């Protein structure tokens, strides 16, 4: 039966619209911005998922373009964008004077800004809108201070008056935020990304931990997911951004350097790092522990039983088990055989366990007992031994799907940072790197004062173009309030007048005039504009106490 013309025309119009949208997306993807980006889907597949509403230019996309240019400039010049975790609009407004990016930390949000109002450690167990809401909080403050400054400068009646105000501050400093481990499966990752884009984030980072067992990057018990599973997360982030026509910057973080667990052994790239038992006479760890718990064992005694099981199990990586078997054998060319094996089975060879076992048997003439199921912990997770080379392997796998890669580490070890950078750049020479200048490190113990002074620049020479102190907002606030509370309790108003207000005057801190900083003059202007130029209730009229500071700032 022939299709009526009206229906045929509708179909043709629909296909023409999709074809046009797909062509526009392809043109967008052909821009230099995407030279290093790998996508696993077509422009048409994105076009059919955008809907009929005209594409929006989200503020996030504007800020993403800005931060990309900032980072690109640092990459070309061999310099560094340095920043730290901002807690609130006060900190953001002051950071804008000196820094070119802003960081929003999930750790800080977990302890100070959960949308459940329930504080806690950095386990990403707060509601998934917590960090996006903090981004929105800070982004709206940035916009407000930008509007306030713009109006003030627009009122200048001469170049001299404008010069007297000093250089304009770029309050619209791009925000890169913590997306933790995605707060669930791929649909959660998609929705979380959408929230960040809608709320003004220029970029987000996501780590390769499990979302159910997520820990702070400086806690024990970290469990990573298979390589491909995290790649799927990164693809989902980019897919969401593409659908929303956002150029969101993606930072791929790996926690594998100190990971001790992995959720699955499905990905062959992880096989080299999975720990197995080499004692065939050992019972499964989970059964062993369950039996002890059922018998009433707990606490320290349970820990002792676990240690005893581990010692008896002979836990090793497969290449270690192979080397031990070779060294125990009667073959004469032991080192040659071990080298032949290691040349084909290494941290970056992505050799499967099946292939490694086959090679081991060819070289040694027998099978080696190695079972990674026996040591599985009671939560069902496999034991894993990461390290720097593991992080290199994962960062290389993630690099095509992210703009920056980051290895979370336990110490500010420059040589380790060099090993990671060189390992990644051996495959991707222009790859951008990020580094966490963590306050979890004991910096005075880790290096000398002179080394502290040059650490950022030295990392920058290795390619770490974005570096950040995750919790500096938290720590500086705690220190300032601790010190002021102590002084105020002892010295009364002298503590505030001399140690706060006078220093604000000396340093030219704009919050000294907190009414003006808060936008009272700007809002007065709106009221007057709405009321024909006059407002009897203007906040900054005659009688405002801030007139006392006219000569100070």
Swiss-Prot record:
- PANTHER family in the record: BIFUNCTIONAL GLYOXYLATE CYCLE PROTEIN, ISOCITRATE LYASE/MALATE SYNTHASE
Gene name as annotated: ICL1
Residues that coordinate or bind Mg(2+)? 178
Q: What is this protein called?
A: Isocitrate lyase
Q: How the protein assembles, per its UniProt entry?
A: Homotetramer.
Recorded source organism is Candida glabrata (strain ATCC 2001 / BCRC 20586 / JCM 3761 / NBRC 0622 / NRRL Y-65 / CBS 138)
GO MF annotation terms? isocitrate lyase activity; metal ion binding; methylisocitrate lyase activity
So what does this thing catalyse? D-threo-isocitrate = glyoxylate + succinate; (2S,3R)-3-hydroxybutane-1,2,3-tricarboxylate = pyruvate + succinate
Subcellular location field: Glyoxysome
Give EC number(s), comma-separated: 4.1.3.1, 4.1.3.30
From its record, what is one biological process in GO terms? tricarboxylic acid cycle
Q: What does this protein do?
A: Catalyzes the formation of succinate and glyoxylate from isocitrate, a key step of the glyoxylate cycle, which operates as an anaplerotic route for replenishing the tricarboxylic acid cycle. Required for growth on ethanol or acetate, but dispensable when fermentable carbon sources are available. Also acts on 2-methylisocitrate.
- Motif Microbody targeting signal, which positions? 551-553
Question: Any idea which UniProt keywords this protein has?
Answer: Glyoxylate bypass, Glyoxysome, Lyase, Magnesium, Metal-binding, Peroxisome, Tricarboxylic acid cycle
| InterPro entries (alphabetical) | ICL/PEPM, Isocitrate_lyase, Isocitrate_lyase_ph_CS, Pyrv/PenolPyrv_kinase-like_dom, Pyrv_kinase-like_dom_sf
Q: Where is the active site?
A: 216
Looking up CDD domains in the UniProt record yields:
ICL_PEPM
Q: In which pathway does it act?
A: Carbohydrate metabolism; glyoxylate cycle; (S)-malate from isocitrate: step 1/2
Q: Which cysteines are joined by disulfide bonds?
A: none
